[in-house]
Swiss-Prot record:
GO terms for cellular component: cytosolic large ribosomal subunit. GO terms for molecular function: RNA binding; structural constituent of ribosome. Belongs to the eukaryotic ribosomal protein eL13 family. The keyword Cell cycle does not apply. Transmembrane segments: none annotated. Keywords: Ribonucleoprotein, Ribosomal protein. This is Large ribosomal subunit protein eL13. The lineage of its organism: Eukaryota, Metazoa, Spiralia, Lophotrochozoa, Platyhelminthes. PROSITE patterns: RIBOSOMAL_L13E (PS01104). Residues 28-53 are annotated as: Disordered. InterPro entries: Ribosomal_eL13 (IPR001380), Ribosomal_eL13_CS (IPR018256). PANTHER family: 60S RIBOSOMAL PROTEIN L13, LARGE RIBOSOMAL SUBUNIT PROTEIN EL13. It comes from Schistosoma mansoni. Residues 31-42 have a biased composition (Basic residues). The gene is RPL13.
């Protein structure tokens, strides 16, 4: 206990603790700097999409998140070739390619091949030499109408099945999720 009329001490600080304090006074300026950098990059890479290259749809790992899908790093070589593209050429037309990625399911492969084909159908490819256009090059009037895409390229949506409300059956009332998971 305290003896006499002494102060109750609570301040157990280390020496020079003020130098170790982390402050966030630069947060609004950093936010503005990031915004300006995004804007500058969009102007620099125009007329390419501002959000960057097309990325694949991948399933999230682990038991907790495996019902969700998100964008991956890049398409596998198998997916790119199945869509009728050369991996080296695909990188030049705004498709991210990851040579390390492997396809573990046929459904995932088909989903990303369809994504690549949809991208290829919507793509406006500027000719390197307008006098000698290549096979995939766009026409002159399409090139004039082309604008930069500001939002994500082919945005990914969660596939959620909508169920209609119904009266629970006797088997549904007897069902226990805990016991079902424990038995697996």
């Amino acid at each position: 206990m305290v003896h006499g009329n002494d102060v109750l001490h609570h301040n157990h600080f280390r020496k020079k603790w003020q130098f170790m304090v982390k402050t966030w006074f630069n947060q609004p300026a950093r936010k503005e700097r990031r915004r300006q950098a995004r804007k500058a990059k969009a102007q620099r890479i125009a007329p390419r999409p501002a959000s960057g290259p097309l990325r694949p749809i991948v399933n999230c790992p682990t038991f907790r998140y495996n019902m969700k899908v998100r964008s991956g790093r890049g398409f596998s070589l198998q997916e790119v070739r199945a869509a009728g593209l050369n991996p080296k050429f695909a990188r030049t037309i705004g498709i991210a390619v990851d040579h390390r990625r492997r396809n573990v399911s046929v459904e995932g492969l088909q989903r990303n091949v369809a994504r690549l084909k949809a991208y290829k159908a919507k793509l406006i490819l500027f000719p390197l030499n307008p006098a000698k256009p290549q096979a995939m090059d766009a026409k002159a009037d399409e090139v004039k109408k082309a604008t930069q895409l500001r939002r994500p390229v082919l945005p990914i949506t969660q596939r959620a099945k909508r169920l209609k409300a119904h009266k629970p059956t006797s088997s549904e009332l007897r069902y226990s999720a805990f016991h079902a998971i424990r038995q697996q």
